[in-house]
Amino acid sequence: MDTVVINAVTKKFGQTVALDALSLTIPMGQMTGIVGADAAGKTTLLRIIIGLLAADTGSVATLGLDPATQKKELTARIGYMPQKFGLYEDLTVRENLEFYADLKEVAKDFSKLLDFTGLEPFQDRLAGKLSGGMKQKLGLACALLGDPEFLVLDEPSVGVDPISRRDLMHLVKTTITPKTTVVWSTAYLDEANSFDNTIVMDQGKVIYNGSPSALAATSAAFEREVIRLMGGYEEKPSQIAAHYVYRESNIEYPVEALDLLKMYGSFAAVKNNTFHIKRGEIFGLLGPNGAGKSTSFKMMCGLARPTAGTAKIMGVDIKKNPTLARSYLGYMAQKFSLYGNMSVRENLEFFAGIYGIPFAEIKERVDNIAAHFGLAVYFDQLSEQLPLGIKQRLSLACALIHNPPILFLDEATSGVDVVTRKEFWCHLRALAEKGVTILITTHFMDEAEYCDNISLFYKGETIAIGTPAALKQQAGATTMEEAFIELINRKDAESGLL
């Protein structure tokens, strides 16, 4: 018996076709992963399956019920974890659980879930104050209330570190029964390759539905096959880098952190952090959620004042001359920091003004960078309406509009599909070859392999620094993900936490 049976379902939003005469089945008692390009229709599909959206045409049966007409009966039998975890950040951990228990009309006995997820000591903490990994666990706990027959997880591992991803997978696999069906959409192909079944989507259609092993025998081959199914990827010379004009300088280390310390009361968020980044180097800051990476980023950008130590940008102390130091930076934040109610052109014009480009030059600069980034066709579209990959491209254009010699990228590929990530890194490597110095944080360990050097950050301090090859050798690992987990575990063992 199948948990989900879909026949010829179409869903449109205005003139945009989200699902195009889509048909599929999802087997009962198995874990099924869903992957696909941005705007492939993954989230729309999941919402139709559980009754949050209605199909325009076609039929849907979930657990033998029609989600459109039997939503209440269906809701009692499913657990759903939306993107960004679906939490109320101004409620505590316990209050979130109580709220979802009321919605599901189930008993408010949370002791097992709190113990299982490790959240028991934090039940009175506001959800908004939790780390990414803890939010992830709370979102899962809310979805598991009532022991659902069908668990639907929409990109639950986006924006969290490898240890949190591993913990989430372990929690799910040890919680479900042999009869539980799990559907898990993901941007991580290693996750998709670990499930019983994998669905690959593109442009509102299912282009593969079967076991990962039937698609490819190895993880590397699986990635190649998924990319091929999604239309393939051919690396081309970066037009973005080709039109970038580097500001010449004789500064050996454009970015320097010297004994940076950041205290919040008695808590040390960053402890004596030191690193030097050469011209044209890609330097990665890796670490678990809550390790202090974002705090370090904020200090290097002048958005947070160090308690002690020095941050230098192109030799300029950012505490002494923040305006000059920031003029050398292009900054691309998590979630891209675009203004959703402004058009693509308006966002570019705004950032050009913020970065100090003379008013008389802004139109020409905006027109040129839009042409190089392939954004002109979207000029009049609101940025909130753009596909995720185009938002990413627009955010990078905003960061580069003043030709900065330094780029700071804070999880700039979070939630973006594998092909878009490869294109993005093609541009970054080409920019680095032209002399741009890049500081980047990421939770994708395959991206860490592209960095020239890496600082592994944990509990506010650097626990390892070097090339990817050196860190793997130090950990006795064959992949960066294995090295990441091993070095963190070693640090915990030294501290008596393991």
What are these regions (language model features)?
Residues 58-66, 73-74, 309-317, 324-325:
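Conserved ABC transporter NBD signature motif
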Residues 140, 168, 396:
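Hydrophobic anchor residue at the start of the ABC signature
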Residues 50, 301:
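Helix-to-loop junction immediately C-terminal to a conserved catalytic motif
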Residues 151-155, 160, 407-410:
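Catalytic Walker B motif of ABC-type/P-loop ATPase nucleotide-binding domains
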